[in-house]
Amino acid sequence: MLDRDGFRPNVGIILLNQRSQVFWGKRIRTHSWQFPQGGIDRGENPEQAMFRELHEEVGLHPQHVQVLARTRDWLRYEVPDRFIRRDARGHYKGQKQIWFLLQLVGHDWDLNLRATNHPEFDAWRWNDYWVPLDVVVEFKRGVYEMALTELSRFVPRCEFRFDARPEQRNRYLRGGLHQRDLLANQSGEPGSFPAAGGIPSYATRPGAPFELPPGATFEPDPQTSFGVNAPTKKT
C-alpha cells in the first residue's frame, strides 16, 4: 500500500525503560541496529499498527507499555535503489512514518524476540537516549534524528541526561564522536559526553539488576569503533 508519491505508511517505536534508556534491536543476521518499526496494514490506524508491530518484533502487549507521545506528522526517508526489488523500482520510493514514544511499565523479561515465527531481531540492548547513529543503516539516520529530537521533550527527566546545546546534540546524533573525545571523557574532562552514549554495562555496574530473557547470552558490543565493550542481550 503506497501513497501517490511512492511512500509506504509505516510506524516507528522508541521504547524506553524506567531509566529512560532506549531499546535497540539488532537486525537478524546483520550488524545493523535499529528501533522497532513496520508497515501499516490496510484498515489499520497508526496506533493499531504500532501495537501489532510491538508484539511481533519485541513480544510486548499494550499492558506492558505506556504511550507517552507521537510525532505530529509523517517523517519520510527514501530507500536507495539497491535495496529495492527490481519489480518495485519506479513505484516504491521509501517509507513515511509516524513515530511513537513508549515507556515499558513491565520488566525486561517481558521482552521476547521470538513472539512470531518470523523474528526481526536476534539481539537487543538498552542505550542512553542520545547516542551516535553509526550502527543504523545510513538512509534511516535522518529520520531517527528527527524523531528523537521531536519526542525528546516527552521523555521522563528523572534519569534523562540531556545536552541542550543544539550543535553538540546534532554532532553527537550524527556519530561525530571521535576517539579523542572518548579518551577525554574517560579521563573525566568537563563537558565531554558519556562514552558511546553511556551504554550501561551489566557486568560492571554494582548491584545492577541482571534480567535476561530465556535463552539469552552475551556477545561483544557491536560499537567496537568506539572501543567500548558492553554486553548485549541475545536471543
Swiss-Prot record:
GO terms for molecular function: pyrophosphatase activity. It is an enzyme of class 3 (hydrolase). This is RNA pyrophosphohydrolase. A motif (Nudix box) lies at residues 38-59. Keywords: Hydrolase. Its cofactor is a divalent metal cation. Pfam families: NUDIX. Residues 184-235 are annotated as: Disordered. Residues 6-149 form the Nudix hydrolase domain. Belongs to the Nudix hydrolase family. RppH subfamily. It comes from the Bacteria. Accelerates the degradation of transcripts by removing pyrophosphate from the 5'-end of triphosphorylated RNA, leading to a more labile monophosphorylated state that can stimulate subsequent ribonuclease cleavage. The keyword Hydrolase applies. Its EC number is 3.6.1.-.
